[in-house]
From Swiss-Prot:
GO terms for biological process, alphabetical: translation
GO cellular component terms, semicolon-separated: cytoplasm; small ribosomal subunit
InterPro entries named among the record's database cross-references: Ribosomal_bS16 (IPR000307), Ribosomal_bS16_CS (IPR020592), Ribosomal_bS16_dom_sf (IPR023803)
Keyword Ribosomal protein: yes
Gene Ontology molecular-function annotations: structural constituent of ribosome
The organism's place on the tree of life at top rank: Bacteria
Keywords of this entry: Ribonucleoprotein, Ribosomal protein
Protein name per the record: Small ribosomal subunit protein bS16
Family from the record: Belongs to the bacterial ribosomal protein bS16 family.
Gene symbol of the encoding locus: rpsP
Pfam family, any one: Ribosomal_S16
Coiled coil location: none
């Protein structure tokens, strides 16, 4: 089973809010997920990012592949170099 760490879009029309989730790569963007590990709010000033570092590191060690956007968020939080 290929596992990805990616963003799940939520929020109102034109006001996106994203949850950072671990999901099977075959499931739809806003579909089923295995575990929620944080959230990202690009609308608020300043942009709000909250990630559970322990869960993120656990999933990365288990082979989960982050998407490009999530990889950038992890770099900002110091989870990966």
């Amino acid at each position: 089973m290929a596992v990805k760490i990616r963003l799940k879009r939520m929020g109102a029309h034109k006001k996106p809010f994203y949850r950072i989730v671990v999901a099977d790569a075959r499931s739809p963007r806003d579909g089923r997920f295995i575990e929620e590990i944080g959230y990202y709010n690009p609308v608020s000033e300043p942009k709000e990012i909250k990630i559970n570092n322990e869960k993120a590191e656990k999933w990365l060690k288990n082979g989960a592949q982050p998407t490009d956007t999530v990889k950038d968020l992890f770099k900002k939080n110091g989870i990966i170099e």
